[in-house]
Amino acid sequence: DFQNLMHVYMDAVFYPNIYQHEEIFRQEGWSYKMDSLEDDLAYNGVVYNEMKGAFSSPEGVLDRVVLNTLFPDTSYANESGGDPEVIPELTYEQFLDFHRRYYHPSNSYIYLYGNMDMEEKLNWLDQEYLSKFDYAPVDSKIRYQEPFDKVIEKEMPYSIASDESEEDNTYISYN
């Protein structure tokens, strides 16, 4: 039911098990993998592998280059899921610091919608979660991108499979 889902989501966001179990970071983020002694050491992890897939799509490459080129001075220039080339640079401590800083009620919007006793739900949220945190100033503003002084051109090569034609995998974006 709705009340139970609110509890599950609020608990997952504000009290995740990542602080008690580093293996969650290793499984979900990134870790080293070696199936046998003959194999090379390789990176692994749910997010790492998902982002490798996202970065292999021509459309995904185009989307990222367009955002990075249009908004280089804002958070939109960065891939929210992480760039697989730099994901392995993330430490467990940096991961926890990021959660402590940004996953805080002071940096949240909570939306409730539907036919319910709104005052009851808001009181519950306050008593069970929000009142247990002190206010913390969080700078999470999305910076304004200043207009460019001149036209910017950007080329981005990407790989395609050997059996794919360049004709069906060539893109141009005019912004």
Specify the residue positions occupied by each region the protein language model found:
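A common structural junction motif
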Residues: 11-20, 127-137
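Helix N-cap motif at beta-to-alpha junctions
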Residues: 114-119
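Non-catalytic beta-strand/loop surface segments
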Residues: 1-3, 22, 35-41, 45, ...
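Extreme N-terminal "head/tail" segments of very large remodeling/mechanoenzyme assemblies
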Residues: 25, 29-30, 49
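Short secondary-structure capping/junction motifs at helix and strand boundaries
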Residues: 2, 15-27
